[in-house]
């Protein structure tokens, strides 16, 4: 049975990689030539996934793109996560550009950053990027052109805002925190941390919370407990299940909402229960 599962996984990954090659060949826009005429000037705020893909697409269509990023490098939220972090959903639903090629269904942080760097280099996005630049003000002049941070000497024909919803790591204040004898860490600070023999409490049951508990157990924690406001669906990483679950946000427009949660629990919680027990 194990050999059959391994064979099926290998076939699935092969077909997935073949699909990515086809997408790359058919849909990747060509990088512009150095002497290509410019269509106009566009400012892109943010150098995360959306900012990077937007800038690459704009440059491929001949626009003169300037990227503003408050961090010291591109990458967005993936610059702040642990080296053990990886996608919680299938990467087939996380393709931010046709050029991207994932070698696994659930790539890790370094793989995702490498794909971002490939797109970045291919479209020469480093030619006009302003790192360590926080955009605090955006205006339009009388001619309808965009002004960034009050610099009226530099204007843009278009503006793309890609700041996203994820910000910098935020530590919440806790009552009696100073008198607590243990260590208090943010979920983004787990690299190379020693959990051997410790009892760990994770506040929050989202993706990073589950990942933190898993990391603690893998590194020898005696026990890991997740505190969450409500139940969450924590299921094994399976491509078909991922695709099915993505239908839920659309509610009654699909029949997925009819599936009882108890059935999901019975079928997919068991692996987590076994691991946490």
What positions do the PLM features span?
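Extreme N-terminal leader/targeting segments of oxidoreductases
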Residues: 1-41, 167-188
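Conserved beta-strand positions that form and line the central face of beta-propeller blades
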Residues: 77, 95, 137, 147, ...
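Phosphate-coordination loops involved in phosphoryl transfer and adenosine-cofactor binding
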Residues: 39-41, 132, 196-198
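Residue-level detector of flexible, active-site-proximal loop/helix-junction positions
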Residues: 100, 136, 142, 189-192, ...
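Conserved beta-strand scaffold positions in the cores of enzyme catalytic domains, especially
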Residues: 93, 129-130, 182-185
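Feature captures the FAD/FMN-dependent oxidoreductase FAD-binding
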Residues: 105-167
């Amino acid at each position: 049975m194990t050999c059959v599962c391994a064979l099926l996984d290998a076939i699935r990954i092969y077909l997935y990689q073949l699909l990515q090659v086809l997408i790359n060949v058919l849909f990747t826009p060509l990088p512009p030539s150095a002497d290509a005429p410019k269509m106009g000037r566009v400012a892109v705020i943010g150098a995360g996934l959306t900012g990077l893909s937007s800038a690459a697409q704009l440059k491929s269509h001949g626009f003169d793109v300037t990227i503003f990023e408050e961090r010291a490098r591109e990458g967005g939220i993936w610059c702040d996560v642990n080296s053990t972090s990886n996608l919680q959903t299938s990467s087939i639903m996380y393709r931010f550009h046709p050029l991207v090629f994932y070698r696994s269904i659930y790539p890790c942080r370094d793989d995702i950053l490498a794909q971002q760097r490939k797109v970045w280099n291919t479209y020469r996005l480093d030619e006009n990027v302003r790192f360590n630049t926080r955009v605090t003000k955006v205006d339009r002049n009388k001619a309808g052109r965009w002004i960034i941070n009050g610099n009226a000497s530099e204007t843009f024909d278009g503006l793309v805002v890609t700041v996203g919803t994820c910000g910098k790591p935020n530590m919440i204040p806790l009552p009696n925190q100073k008198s607590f004898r243990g260590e208090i860490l943010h979920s983004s600070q787990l690299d190379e941390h020693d959990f051997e023999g410790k009892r760990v409490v994770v506040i929050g049951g989202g993706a990073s919370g589950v990942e933190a508990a898993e990391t603690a157990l893998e590194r020898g924690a005696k026990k890991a407990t997740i505190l969450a406001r409500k139940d969450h669906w924590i299921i094994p990483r399976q491509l078909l299940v991922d695709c099915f679950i993505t239908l839920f946000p659309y509610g009654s427009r699909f029949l997925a909402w009819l599936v009882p949660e108890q059935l999901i629990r019975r079928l997919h919680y068991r692996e987590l229960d076994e691991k946490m027990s």
